[in-house]
A protein has these predicted regions:
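Non-catalytic linker/capping segments at the edges of enzyme domains
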Residues: 1-51
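Short, surface-exposed charged micro-motifs
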Residues: 27-29, 99, 113-115
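A conserved, well-ordered hydrophobic junction motif at loop->secondary-structure transitions
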Residues: 38-74
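Hydrophobic beta-strand-centered segment that forms part of the acyl-chain substrate-binding groove
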Residues: 70-111
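Preference for bulky hydrophobic residues occupying beta-strand positions
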Residues: 39-41, 98, 114, 128
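A general secondary-structure signal for short beta-strands and their flanking turns/coil
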Residues: 34-36, 93, 109, 123
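HotDog/MaoC-like acyl-thioester-processing domains
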Residues: 1-10, 103-130
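Hydrophobic residues on conserved beta-strands that form the core of alpha/beta folds
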Residues: 27, 93-95, 125
Length: 130
């Protein structure tokens, strides 16, 4: 299954979190699994906050890019359109709230999951967990 980011045109593929054309970024890949989206990411040692744990900014960055990709995919799905069709649906984050419930170990795979909560016009609300 193609990741959402595989459908981004080169002109918008420079994002630090999800851009395939940014060699220094996370280059996340997001796919549908039923009614939710999933990204899998393995932190590197340079993502450390304190020994053994991932930096909180990394978590927020992963949530941000995973969520905007989900918003676009949800709009395509609602419209019954292919993700390569024009005009393109693109989103930026209007609000990001993260509750850090416990430190995130750096030595394993992070699984980011997102569910659509609401589409109202051009506004898409999602809920994401790591």
């Amino acid at each position: 299954m193609d990741a959402f980011q595989d459908h981004y045109p080169d002109s918008v593929a420079h994002c630090y979190g999800c851009g395939s054309r940014n060699p220094h970024g996370h280059q996340i890949k997001t796919v549908w699994e039923g009614d939710e989206t999933v990204t899998r990411f393995r932190p590197e040692p340079f993502h450390t906050s304190v020994p053994g744990f991932a930096y909180g900014g990394l978590i927020a960055s992963l949530i941000d890019c995973h969520s905007t990709g989900t918003a676009a995919a949800a709009m395509y799905r609602q419209a019954g359109r292919d993700m390569d069709s024009l005009p393109a649906f693109r989103f930026v984050t209007g609000s990001l709230h993260v509750d850090f419930l416990k430190p995130t170990p750096i030595d394993g795979e992070l699984v980011i999951r997102c569910r659509l909560r609401e589409i109202k016009g051009r506004k898409v609300v999602v809920e994401t967990t790591v």
